[in-house]
């Protein structure tokens, strides 16, 4: 995958796999990297990347990756300032450690994993990454239409790359 000169978005960029991915994209010559995270730590990551680049390679979008309005605004802002997103790494993830079934050793009663926790984990780790990908594909489609292009043809090359991430904790 060609990274040099591309515009990228990395969610979960404040720590872990997201942070490491953002640094690697910078090392490989991405033109702009939008760092997305709920944590304030994302500003430190941007500062590190910008200090190393001296050209202001990284931008920060602090917010909730499950919020559709936030997601759309991130893509619209990037398109207006840097062009269409060409690389997406939706690496934001959460865990809510708990056994799926827990047996109380004194009472013998079993309790199951709380539904609200399960829904939250699925929303962040599965649904949100898919919708970030759909947002990118929609933006590429709009850009193609604006340029008078119709159906994609293989000789046009890649329009974008989406890299889904998983880990033991997510």
Descriptions of predicted regions:
Residues 2-34:
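Canonical Rossmann dinucleotide-binding motif of NAD(H)/NADP(H)-dependent dehydrogenases/reductases
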Residues 11, 85-101, 125, 164:
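Rossmann-fold scaffold of SDR-type NAD(P)-dependent oxidoreductases
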Residues 30-44:
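Conserved glycine-rich Rossmann-like NAD(P)H-binding loop of the short-chain dehydrogenase/reductase
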Residues 43, 62-73, 115:
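The beta1-alpha1 cofactor-binding region of Rossmann-like NAD(H)/NADP(H)-dependent oxidoreductases
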Residues 52-57, 76-90, 96, 111-114, ...:
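A glycine-rich helix->loop->beta "capping" turn
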Residues 94, 107-133, 163:
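Catalytic Tyr-X3-Lys loop
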Residues 123-156:
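Amphipathic alpha-helical dimer-interface segment in Rossmann-like NAD(P)H-dependent oxidoreductases
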Residues 167:
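Residue(s) in the substrate-gating loop at a strand-loop-helix junction
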């Amino acid at each position: 995958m060609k990274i040099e000169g591309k515009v990228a978005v990395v969610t979960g960029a404040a720590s872990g796999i997201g942070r490491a991915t953002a640094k690697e994209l910078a090392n490989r010559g991405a033109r702009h990297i939008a760092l997305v995270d709920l944590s304030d730590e994302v500003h430190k990551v941007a500062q590190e990347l910008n200090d190393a680049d001296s050209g202001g390679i990284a931008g920060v979008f602090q917010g909730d990756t499950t919020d559709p309005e936030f997601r759309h605004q991130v893509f619209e802002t990037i398109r207006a300032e840097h062009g269409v997103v060409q690389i997406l790494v939706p690496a934001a993830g959460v865990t809510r450690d708990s056994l799926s079934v827990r047996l109380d050793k004194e009472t013998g009663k079993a309790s199951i994993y709380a539904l609200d926790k399960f829904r939250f984990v699925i929303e962040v780790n599965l649904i949100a990454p898919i919708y970030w990908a759909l947002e990118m594909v929609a933006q590429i489609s709009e850009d193609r239409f604006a340029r008078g292009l119709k159906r994609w043809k293989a000789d046009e090359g890649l329009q974008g790359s989406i890299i889904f991430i998983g880990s033991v904790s997510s």
